[in-house]
Amino acid sequence: MSEPRLRAQLVDYSQRLHARGWVANHDGNLSARIADGRFLCTPTATSKAEVSADGLLIVDGSGQRITGRSKPFGELGLHMCVYKSRTDVQAVIHAHPPHATALAATGLAL
């Protein structure tokens, strides 16, 4: 998939997460694999409702910023671990759906 199309999809999914209430304020983050061991990711401290294609960052496989004005989000290391251990995974989304958060707060085992 082309980088511009991937950027558009990350923006679309960011806005969907926000619209559904699955992320609050600056919570949650998204990333996607692009060519040559690089990754697109959402910036830190940005509402998912306000994510824009030109505001996305490009990072290398260790999570170091290559392009973009903002800093990468703090959980990027988790995303990188997923990509390293699962080469078939093309994108990672970290959200906080209210029902999942409520279940986690109960301490019940799955």
Show where each model-derived region lies.
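Glycine-rich flexible loops
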Residues: M1-L110
